[in-house]
Amino acid sequence: MRSFTNLNPCYVLLPFFLVLATNATHTNNFLPRPRTGYYGSACWNVESIVRSVVESNYLANPANAPGILRMHFHDCFVQGCDASVLLAGPNSERTAIPNLSLRGFNVIEEAKTQLEIACPRTVSCADILALAARDFVHLAGGPWWPVPLGRLDGRISLASNVILPGPTDSVAVQKLRFAEKNLNTQDLVVLAAGHTIGTAGCIVFRDRFFNYDNTGSPDPTIAPSFVPLIQAQCPLNGDPATRVVLDTGSGDQFDTSYLNNLKNGRGLLESDQVLWTNLETRPIVERLLGLRFPFLIFGLEFARSMTKMSQIEIKTGLDGEIRRVCSAVN
C-alpha cells in the first residue's frame, strides 16, 4: 500500500498568485467567484471529504488518477467547467465518441453523496471534479495547488457539442483549440504533459505505427526501437480497445518522463510527438526538461495551467445550479 506521507515536498505548492481570495463564505455575493475559501463555514470540510474519497479510490485503482484528470479536461473544454460531462442520458456528452472511454464517474458520485450528507445542496459537482483532479494528480506524485471554488453545475449536455483536441492534431490545430479557451501555447504543452500518467487505446494510434498517412510504414518521427515495442502490444489484427501506457517506463508516476520520451522519439500519440518536432513548442519542452534557459518547473507550471483551465467558461448566478446528484439535473 502506498503511503501518502512520503510525497515529494517540492511538489506541495502554495503559490500566492493562485490564491484569488481567502476566508470568504459562499453567502457573500459581492466577492468574485470562483475563489479559494468560497464555501467557508457552509462546508468547511469540503476539501477533506473529497480528499478522503480520492485517497480510497486511488488505493483501490491508481488508474482513477488519469481517468479523473482526463474527465476534468474533457469537461472544461466543452461548454466550460460545469460538470456537464457527468450528466447521463441519451445524446449527452458522455455518449460522444471521445468520452466513451472516460472512467471515474463513480468516484465523483461517491464524493457528492458524502458532501450531501455533510453539507446538503451546497457543493457543486463541478467543484468536486476540480478538487478530485488536483488530489489525484498529487497522489500520483504531482503538484498540489489551491483550487478556486464556486462553480455552478450546467444544465445542458449534448454529444454534438463535444469538440476536443484529437490524438492526430497538428500543433496549429491544437493551438487553435486551446486559444478558443483562452489558453496559450505554453498551457498546451504543459497540459499535454499530463499524459505522464494514463493509457490510450490501440485504435487511437495504431495506424501511426503500421501505416502512417497510408504510406505502409510507421511515422518516421518515431524512434526505430520504439516501433516493434508498440506493434507487439497493438498488432494489426489485435483488439483495438487494448490499452497501452502513454509514458513508457513511468506510466503511474507524475513526472517529466513523458516529455523526455518526446525528445527521444518515443511519444505514443502523434499530437504529443509533434510538440517536439515543432519549432515553436520544442523550446517549451526543452525548458520543462531543464535543457534550455530560462528553465520551467513542470510541477509549478502544471499547477498554473490547471488553475487557468479549471476556470474556463464557469457558470454563475442563474446560469447554473447545485445538483443533488451529479448524473442528473435537479
UniProtKB/Swiss-Prot annotation:
User: Which residues belong to the signal peptide in this entry?
Assistant: 1-24
> Has the keyword Secreted been applied to this entry?
yes
EC id? 1.11.1.7
Localized where? Secreted
Signal among keywords: yes
The residues listed in the UniProt record as binding heme b, with positions renumbered to this chain, are H195
Q: What is this protein called?
A: Peroxidase 70
Q: What is the lineage of its organism?
A: Eukaryota, Viridiplantae, Streptophyta, Embryophyta, Tracheophyta
- Give the gene that encodes this protein: PER70
